[in-house]
């Protein structure tokens, strides 16, 4: 996992140079949104279960996926879906705090699509639930932090698609 600071410093270090104006602007931007990201992470942590519950209600609960024969029909499958959504929320929050999506590749996306396909987990329903979670989260953390979190939810969705 990298954070925005490490990424900027490593880029300059590899080139054997001091931080240039563009690198310093990236750091300035990262630091200027620090309080916003920490407040958002605090709100998300305090409301994680409710965020996941509302996202499921908005996107999956009354669809064919929860009816007999659907992929979330049994309690075990439903619990696995809830667990996965909570996992995505947690790692999207980590990525937002770091200002870098690399943790999502390392800890979430590597092999996930293949695993879901082999288990018969519908990718489109997963993406739909993540998009619902993005909306629910934005309504709790406000438009600016919601936009920032949205980047990482979209990154997960893109990686699954």
Curated annotation (Swiss-Prot):
Locations listed in the record: Cellular thylakoid membrane
Modified residues (N4-methylasparagine): 71
GO biological process: photosynthesis
Keywords for this protein: Antenna complex, Bile pigment, Chromophore, Electron transport, Membrane, Methylation, Photosynthesis, Phycobilisome, Thylakoid, Transport
Any GO CC annotation of this UniProt entry: phycobilisome
Function: Light-harvesting photosynthetic bile pigment-protein from the phycobiliprotein complex. Allophycocyanin has a maximum absorption at approximately 650 nanometers.
Family: Belongs to the phycobiliprotein family.
The protein's name in its UniProt record: Allophycocyanin beta chain
Organism name: Mastigocladus laminosus
Gene for this chain: apcB
